[in-house]
UniProtKB/Swiss-Prot annotation:
Stored InterPro entries: Aldolase_TIM (IPR013785), NadC (IPR004393), NadC/ModD (IPR027277), Nicotinate_pribotase-like_C (IPR036068), Quinolinate_PRibosylTase_N_sf (IPR037128), Quinolinate_PRibosylTrfase_C (IPR002638), Quinolinate_PRibosylTrfase_N (IPR022412)
Pfam family, one: QRPTase_C
Main location as per UniProt: mitochondrion
Organism: Nicotiana tabacum
PANTHER family on file: NICOTINATE-NUCLEOTIDE PYROPHOSPHORYLASE [CARBOXYLATING] (PTHR32179:SF3)
Classification via CDD domains: QPRTase
Expression triggers: Triggered by wounding and jasmonic acid (MeJA).
Name the record gives this protein: Quinolinate phosphoribosyltransferase [decarboxylating] 2b, mitochondrial
Family statement: Belongs to the NadC/ModD family.
Function: Involved in the biosynthesis of pyridine alkaloid natural products, leading mainly to the production of anabasine, anatabine, nicotine and nornicotine, effective deterrents against herbivores with antiparasitic and pesticide properties (neurotoxins); nornicotine serves as the precursor in the synthesis of the carcinogen compound N'-nitrosonornicotine (NNN). Involved in the catabolism of quinolinic acid (QA).
Keyword Endoplasmic reticulum: no
One GO BP annotation of this record: response to wounding
């Protein structure tokens, strides 16, 4: 429905002209009651400012002139309803972020949801509604949908992978869109996955380049243990292994020395076969060799088709970069009440 009102509607600067914003990676907390009350909250980060990322998305859309199409076609004093529509089946994610965006553009907009983050929606379902100034609804529309479609796509694939991987846990990686690290990882949590390290700061992850530079697995582990002790740091430590021999080398080091090691990555120990199946015998052997002394993580050749078999090997975690680096957005839309188009036409003498 629509209705004309006296011209008191809030028209946010994004609608007219927006200053150039730079994301400040500060530790300012995002104050939003919706976010704070969620069961699945965004993961913690010491410097990431979610609100500034949201503002940057609005600013890059508005440019220096604002929405010139809205200015030309939508009366500033018009109110309307707009409905969120699922155009395919999937898991919805990004509801809390959408509310933040609408509130930033126009605090008077009223948003109502019929589902929660993490709920499954089916094609054709109207799952939310926005009421208020039509001009501002349309300005916020694309930024809201960009975040929600990406997050929902990540959550949908994560849910499928997490269910198939059981009893192992599914993890994403740091292969996220630049600037959207926290948003992507939040979507993984909403989809039922778990987060790998947030960045370079919250976990030591010894990979092939570190091992080569240090002169071997044992020397790399020793250097890490010394560094953590000297700097009084208590964080998780993971080391990458690619062969059974490297697993034995790690276990040999750990048996002789007190170590901060918490997890062993078993990289590319899943071997694709010509018939489309996978050979997980090396992965099983490594898991049995470790025998619960450390958490284990399978990595490499992880797909929706292979993850169930990998999960049956006894690994603790399975990591997949595809959860965030190859996102298929969930198709959803936000449609203003169709009667609005006629009203706009009448007001502008185009109908």
């Amino acid at each position: 429905m629509f209705r004309a009102i006296p011209f008191t509607a809030t028209v946010h600067p994004y609608a007219i002209t927006a200053p150039r914003l730079v994301v400040k990676m500060s530790a300012i907390a995002t104050k939003n009651t919706r976010v704070e009350s969620l069961e699945v909250k965004p993961p913690a980060h010491p410097t990431y400012d979610l609100k500034e990322v949201m503002k940057l998305a609005l600013s890059e859309d508005a440019g220096n002139l604002g929405d010139v199409t809205c200015k030309a076609t939508i009366p500033l004093d018009m109110e309307s309803d707009a409905h969120f529509l699922a155009k395919e089946d999937g898991i919805i994610a990004g509801i809390a972020l959408a509310e933040m965006i609408f509130a930033e553009v126009d605090p008077s907009l009223k948003v109502e949801w019929y589902v929660n983050d993490g709920d499954k929606v089916h094609k054709g379902l109207k799952f939310g509604k926005v009421q208020g100034n039509a001009y501002n609804i349309v300005i916020a529309e694309r930024v809201v949908l960009n975040f929600m479609q990406r997050m929902s796509g990540i959550a949908t694939l994560t849910k499928e992978m997490a269910d198939a991987a059981h009893p192992a846990y599914i993890l994403e990686t740091r292969k996220t869109a630049p600037g959207l690290r926290l948003v992507d990882k939040w979507a993984v949590l909403i989809g039922g996955g778990k987060n790998h390290r947030m960045g370079l700061f919250d976990m030591v992850m010894i990979k092939d380049n570190h091992i080569s530079a240090a002169g071997g697995v044992g020397k790399a582990l020793k250097s890490v243990d010394q560094y953590l002790e000297q700097n009084k740091l208590q964080i998780g430590v993971e080391v990458e292994t690619r062969t059974i021999e490297e697993v034995r080398e790690v276990l040999d080091y750990a048996s002789q020395t007190k170590t901060s090691l918490t997890r062993i990555m078993l990289d590319n120990m899943v071997v694709p076969l010509s018939n489309g199946d996978i050979d997980v015998s090396m992965l099983k052997e490594a898991v049995e060799l470790i025998n619960g002394r450390f958490d284990t993580e399978a990595s490499g050749n992880v797909t929706l088709e292979t993850v169930h078999k990998i999960g049956q090997t006894g690994v603790t975690y399975i990591s997949s970069g595809a959860l965030t680096h190859s996102v298929k957005a969930l198709d959803i839309s936000l449609k203003i009440d169709t009667e609005l188009a006629l009203e706009v036409g009448r007001r502008t003498k185009r109908a």
